[in-house]
Amino acid sequence: SQAAKVMKTRSEVGDCHFKFNHVLYKHMNVPALEKTDRRVVQTEWCTPKPGVTSDQLKAKHDSWLAASKDKLNSIGWAIIIPKLGQANSAGSFMHFFIFDSLGALMRDQDWQANGGGAAGIQDYYNSYADCSGPSVWSGSIAQRPSQ
């Protein structure tokens, strides 16, 4: 299979380390995710501020999604919580946003800079979590389970 071929030759393109995570899917536009194999992924490691509970973080994430859902440029958002094999993770959890193009990512950046998105993000950084700042990755899905 194509997946076996990718796994067999992975050392030619980089060092791979396999991790086990718990994933909390916050928003997934399944038709958009299935439409293309193209992915632009923005990740950001965060750690709750002292005294902020998991329930408070969940409530903040849920309220942000409810207020922003009609403005989303991403086709997916998940919170990833490291489990096995993550002794040196860069935080307690990671925001994982999926875009279907660089254009969608840039529309999101424009919304943050000019459309009111920055206020919610700054509130999150000030009151809820210390975060590393976003990193962006671009690529394509090599193998889908249905193939």
Where in the sequence are the language-model features?
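Short S/T/G/P-rich N-terminal loop/turn motif that feeds into the first structured element of a domain
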Residues: 1-147
